[in-house]
């Protein structure tokens, strides 16, 4: 071997109180050399046989980078190196530029902007603006002072609904965007309902609501068919509109007052909620059927797994739509009853009680549903209870302390149900008690409905003659 080989380095490595002379390759990374050096020192008893992280450094210099070679670090023949264990904790980093360090820290903690969140925000904003504009048009139609351009207003609203429906088709069929398609379909349904309400001449009444509900049902079904997206939501809207249309049709035929129509619609909605599971099974084709002559040896006569899976998914979608529709129709009926009875001394308490019981029943049903369905029940129940509380507070404006105390109590109950109750482990007796309370509240809907329909007054004024 020549006296001076440029590919080798003759160095002395110190480790604690021991030292060893080694010839190391100059083109091998330091991280590859360290295990061999540790093994040599370990054989000589200079290092304990414990796992640790080692570093190699020159005298009075920082540790050599593990990815570099001895030649790159400037190590020559005769150099003295020190093998030592690395510290358990890395040194605290120091910042030369405070502004750059602050920006880097914020970049690591800030969440990236989610495109889905932006799209949902835009969809929610568009829906709320459309609903707000529709409510203002309905308010103007109910007022006796605003009577001009009613036909033109209905035409513009109908044209806007058709345009929204056209853009919904483009969004779903061309761009494959279900969020935009569903939002535009809902907007078209709102415009269709408002156009139907304004199409009836005169001040809106039961007949106007009937036309509006049928227009909303037709628009939602049409949007669902031509767009192919948002089937669950649009089905729920259509079913809810059909229930409202049926209730208003009864009111138009019998000339019943609004509290009676609303209370009967609410009671019917709870009845439909009880049979919604059976309806979903029937509509999905999962109802048990007796085949005419089933041969056990004929495998083709039995349903396949794929077909059963498709029907099961269809039944789940139908159940979600029906539950949402009937919960919404119960909410609309209860709110309409509470608002219609406001100012009527005899029936005001009945409307408030009906809305409060309806909200409680919907909130109780939210505990036994999954995430999607419980959210619908919770929103409907909270809206109904809030309406009942608002009407009751407006009826008793002179009792300010009681209103403040009731507000604080309801807020505390809401916080308890949202944050504390989910973490509690309830006993079977408690579950049975809650179910019993739900049954009692459902039974109480019948006498409340009879009260609001005027059944008790009619019986009281009967002139029965016993012979």
UniProtKB/Swiss-Prot annotation:
Keywords from the UniProt entry: Cell membrane, Membrane, Transmembrane, Transmembrane helix
UniProt subcellular location: Cell membrane
Keyword Transferase part of the UniProt annotation: no
GO cellular component: peptidoglycan-based cell wall; plasma membrane
InterPro entries for this protein: EccD_transm (IPR044049), T7SS_EccD (IPR006707), YukD-like (IPR024962)
Membrane topology label: Multi-pass membrane protein
Location, primary (coarse class): membrane
Source domain of life: Bacteria
Keyword Nucleotide-binding: no
Classification via Pfam families: EccD (PF19053), YukD (PF08817)
Membrane-crossing residue ranges in chain numbering: 122-142, 152-172, 186-206, 209-229, 241-261, 264-284, 319-339, 344-364, 374-394, 401-421, 439-459
Entry's family note: Belongs to the EccD/Snm4 family.
Oligomeric form and interacting partners: Part of the ESX-4 / type VII secretion system (T7SS), which is composed of cytosolic and membrane components.
Further details from the record: Was identified as a high-confidence drug target.
Protein name, entry field: ESX-4 secretion system protein eccD4
């Amino acid at each position: 071997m020549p006296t001076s080989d440029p590919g080798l380095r003759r160095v002395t490595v110190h480790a604690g109180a021991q030292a060893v002379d080694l010839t190391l390759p100059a083109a091998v990374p330091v991280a590859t050399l360290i295990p061999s050096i540790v093994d040599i020192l370990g054989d000589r008893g200079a290092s304990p046989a414990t796992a640790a992280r080692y570093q190699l450094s020159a005298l009075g210099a920082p540790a050599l980078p593990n990815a570099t070679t001895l030649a790159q670090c400037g190590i020559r023949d005769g150099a003295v190196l020190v093998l030592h264990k690395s510290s358990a904790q890395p040194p605290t980093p120091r910042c030369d530029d405070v502004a750059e360090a602050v920006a880097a820290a914020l970049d690591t903690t800030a969440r990236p902007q989610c495109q889905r969140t932006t799209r949902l925000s835009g969809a929610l904003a568009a829906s709320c603006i459309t609903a707000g504009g529709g409510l203002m048009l309905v308010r103007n139609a109910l007022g006796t002072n605003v009577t001009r351009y009613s036909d033109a207003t209905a035409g513009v609203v109908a044209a806007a609904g058709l345009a929204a429906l056209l853009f919904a088709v483009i969004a779903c069929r061309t761009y494959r965007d279900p969020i935009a398609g569903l939002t535009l379909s809902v907007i078209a349904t709102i415009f269709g309902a408002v156009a139907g309400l304004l199409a009836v001449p005169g001040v809106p009444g039961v007949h106007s609501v009937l036309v509006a509900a049928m227009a909303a049902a037709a628009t939602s079904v049409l949007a669902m068919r031509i767009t192919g997206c948002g089937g669950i939501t649009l089905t729920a809207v259509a079913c809810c509109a059909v229930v409202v249309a049926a209730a208003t049709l009864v009111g138009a035929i019998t000339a019943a007052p609004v509290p009676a129509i609303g209370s009967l619609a609410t009671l019917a909605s709870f009845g439909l909620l009880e049979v919604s599971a059976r309806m979903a099974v029937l509509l999905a084709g999962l109802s048990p059927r007796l085949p005419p002559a089933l041969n056990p040896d004929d495998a083709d006569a039995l349903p396949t797994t794929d077909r059963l899976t498709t029907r099961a998914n269809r039944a789940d979608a139908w159940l979600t739509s029906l539950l949402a529709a009937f919960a919404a129709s119960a909410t609309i009926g209860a709110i309409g009853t509470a608002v219609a009875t406001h100012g009527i001394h005899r029936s005001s308490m009945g409307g408030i009680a009906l809305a409060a019981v309806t909200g409680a029943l919907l909130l109780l049903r939210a505990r036994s549903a999954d995430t999607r369905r419980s959210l619908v029940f919770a929103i409907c129940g909270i809206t109904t209870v809030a309406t009942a509380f608002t009407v009751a507070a407006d009826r008793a404006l002179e009792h300010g302390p009681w209103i403040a105390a009731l507000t604080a109590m309801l807020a505390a109950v809401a916080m308890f149900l949202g944050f504390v109750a989910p973490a509690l482990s309830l006993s079977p007796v408690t579950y049975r008690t809650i179910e019993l309370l739900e049954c009692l509240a459902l039974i109480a809907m019948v006498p409340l409905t009879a009260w609001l329909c005027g059944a008790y007054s009619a019986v009281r004024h009967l002139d029965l003659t016993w012979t």
